[in-house]
Amino acid sequence: MSDFIFTSESVTEGHPDKICDQISDAVLDALLTEDPESRVACETVVNTGLCLLTGEITSKAKVDYIKLVRNVIKEIGYEGYRAGGFDANSCAVLVALDEQSPDISQGVNDADDINDDLEDNTGAGDQGIMFGYACDETPELMPLPISLAHRLAIQLAKVRHEEVLNYLLPDGKTQVSIDYEKGLPVSINTILISTQHNSEIDGVTNEEEIRQRIKEDLWKNVVIPATEDLEIKPNISKTRFLVNPTGKFVVGGPQGDAGLTGRKIIVDTYGGYARHGGGAFSGKDPTKVDRSAAYAARYVAKSIVKAKLAKKAEVQLSYAIGVAKPISILVETFDTGVISQNNLTELIKEHFDLRPAAIIKEFNLRNLPKKMGGKFFRKTASYGHFGRRDLELPWENVEEKAAKLAEASKIFL
């Protein structure tokens, strides 16, 4: 199928599930900042007037979890009159955290394939499959639909925080549909933005008048600024633009829907454009390959595309709990590769060390929270873990690796 419409969505930091992801990763940042060897699997639940922290943590760090939770909720924007019914200062915060199972800890600390190589000593924290993807549709080598959906969500949050549109509240979602012809993006078919707002705007309470006001404001202050540097731009006469299609969006955030860590895994990755292994990222320390190996798979895929060895690349990795080396490595280039997929796999095995300890070392994952002032993983917990133009993410820095791949591939050309 060469002609089609593909759609991806994003959500703002005030979405209930994203509140949870940010809290879980804020806990991770705090623990790793004090104790880089912390083992963390932190899950968060939010509902009307309630936040629950649960999971398994083994760490020497001392963290005031209740204070941390309230600060994250406050920074997102749920405080006082702008809280939309969920307030950082008054919500109940419950903490129910246990230690990591000694059976799991044993497998991670002493890998089944242990030998004299220190990086073989750390086994994978669980079994699982992870996918990484890259394509040449955008400068950051991400699919255009998810890239544009994130741009809109980021800009929507920005105009709220800066009070450019002072009637906006924290919860919101974006969705973008792109027209493809012969497999290439050619135009923006539809943009959908759902955003929480006050029940009254400048004295206006009529539902349709409010919706029209929001629509006009969002086109001017969100859509245009978010897309002004793109080659493919929305056209006000051709691009379908939908805003709050149900009519109004006053009740939102945890007051409107319960939230849970790990429920936006497609938003976190490639917007459905590539396959997903099923594992979430937030609240998990780097020994959890759901997170670290997914970052490594993106690193590999992006390096391949950056080296111009393929226009599209999807990499699958699989692991067994307590075993350091990947069980399997698979690369798919969708008939866009300049060398065979078997040759690409050889290059991957030669140039990328995909054992958990090696990934952690390559990306400095244990020490980045402290290096970044206690806030690293939390910043990835909204607006995507890949292709971020606003963050310095080590798995996105592929220039050096891509150059080596390009040089090494010459023997196959």
From Swiss-Prot:
Alphabetized UniProt keyword annotations: ATP-binding, Cytoplasm, Magnesium, Metal-binding, Nucleotide-binding, One-carbon metabolism, Potassium, Transferase
PANTHER family given in the database record: S-ADENOSYLMETHIONINE SYNTHETASE
Names of required cofactors: Mg(2+); K(+)
Protein name per UniProt: S-adenosylmethionine synthase
Binding site for ATP: 15, 171-173, 248-249, 257, 263-264, 280, 284
Coiled coil, from the record: none
HAMAP family: S_AdoMet_synth1
Region (Flexible loop): 100-110
